[in-house]
Design a protein with these regions (language model features):
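A well-structured
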Residues: 2-171
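Contiguous, non-catalytic segments that form substrate-binding/exosite surfaces or channel walls
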Residues: 114-256
Length: 257
């Protein structure tokens, strides 16, 4: 049986996902176990993978595969009664085209600069956090903001820079809608915060081991499968997927807090 265009697109996407999972694995290690002196080489690794991923996500080959799969789907639609299947595939095509158009507008040099700035910025942020000195991180932060604004300009002029950068996480989100949603909170939160600040401070002296055990028990209550989920510690908690059956969560615990 001849390979379909949809299958060819799937094979291409699988390779891209494998590269993305390698990128995520490096990021996980950077946050949870990498020695400080490994930061420079890690920056090179992450920058290289970001470059390769951008090339794949903006390539003519990717564009042709999407279009061929779209045409093939149109042929199937004319001869199929399974509209749910068709709608599902049409949505996939729509999202892939959106991703392709976004990537195609980006300058490869900017993609590399951003990847390098994020990696170096994370290193400086850790140092600034340890020393409680924001000035250490400030120049890296300013560089990241400048690059992000340029990224937004290259992608689209339809939204503000913030709205453009938010689209992969919150599609169609606008500042107008966001302001409307948060206005009630802006009206009520100040009084709540003042009340909290006036209340009696409660100190619960938990050892690191007790905090770790508490986090583990909570995850078990939520139904954690220990064959699928690994928990680590990082300066800032996050979750990340490294593969179809590999999910990582981090927490941050401090002695006496």
């Amino acid at each position: 049986m001849a390979e379909t265009h949809w299958n060819k697109l799937g094979a291409y996407l699988k390779e891209t996902q494998i590269l993305g999972s390698i990128q995520n694995t490096l990021y996980w290690d950077q946050n949870t176990g990498m020695p400080k002196k490994g930061a420079s080489w890690r920056s090179e690794q992450l920058t290289y993978i970001a470059k390769v991923l951008h090339e794949r996500n903006s390539s003519e080959e990717f564009s042709n595969l999407i279009q061929s799969a779209k045409n093939e789907l149109a042929d199937i639609e004319r001869n199929s009664d399974n509209q749910l299947f068709i709608k599902d595939k049409e949505r996939n095509i729509s999202l892939l085209l959106k991703e392709f158009n976004r990537e195609r507008n980006l300058d490869p040099k900017l993609v590399e600069s951003l990847a390098k700035a994020k990696s170096k910025g994370y290193e400086s942020w850790q140092e600034a956090k340890e020393k409680s000195d924001f000035k250490i991180f400030l120049p890296f932060f300013e560089e990241l903001v400048k690059l992000r604004i340029e990224e937004a300009k290259q992608i689209s002029d339809q939204y503000s820079p913030w709205e453009t950068l938010a689209q992969p996480f919150e599609p169609e989100l606008t500042l107008k809608w966001l302001n409307k949603m948060f206005q009630p909170l802006k009206d009520t939160l100040p009084e709540l915060i003042r009340g909290i600040n006036k209340s009696k401070k409660y100190h619960w002296d938990l050892s690191l081991e007790s905090q770790h055990n508490l986090c583990s028990q909570l995850l078990d209550e939520f139904g954690r499968d220990k064959d699928l989920v690994v928990v680590g510690k990082s300066p800032h908690p996050f979750s990340i997927t490294l593969g179809p059956n590999d999910y990582r969560i981090t927490t941050r615990i401090v002695e006496g807090e």
